[in-house]
Amino acid sequence: MPQGDAHVTIAVDGGNPQHYTGIGYHDHNWGNISMLKLMHDWYWARGKIAEYTLIASYITAERQYGSKTFPIFMLAKDGKVIADDATKVRFSMRDVAIEPDTGKPVAHQVIYEYIDGPERYVLTFTREKDILHNKFIEDLHGIKVILARLLRVDGAYLRFTGELSLEHYKADQLVETRRDEALWELMYFGHVTRK
């Protein structure tokens, strides 16, 4: 469900209930093997800009699977899917630097470009704030920490907020530009490749 209506009531420690409404998102991981064994890293994002809704991901497989990449992309306008063919997606990153807390390479900009004949959409996520750095080993305790260190567990999860811009081109003519805030993540199971 890329976008649904959310109605939430929260009461903390028996206090007065607080009521909130907004948009909600739900996804589900599926498969019969651990993602840790299959995936090296991925960028994942969702966003809403005016009448557009976006879900985008770029997955890199582990080295034993050839480090192959898999884009996932869906762009809808007014609830109707207008772009969802992964073979038409080009993914790129700008200003990649090592994030000091996790040691993972993080892009300042993540760009998904969707080209379908004369139609082209460019969606650019520009990182403004890191809202979460989670090193997986820090969630472990006791003997599990020792085992994780022996196995060289090095995974991290990072979440960012910033601006999402959408540019729509027809035959190389810019016909529409939209901007809004967005949330996206980098899940980095694997080790950073040293050059």
For each feature predicted by the language model, list its residue ranges.
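Structured soluble/peripheral alpha/beta segments that form catalytic or ligand/cofactor-binding pockets
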Residues: 1-195
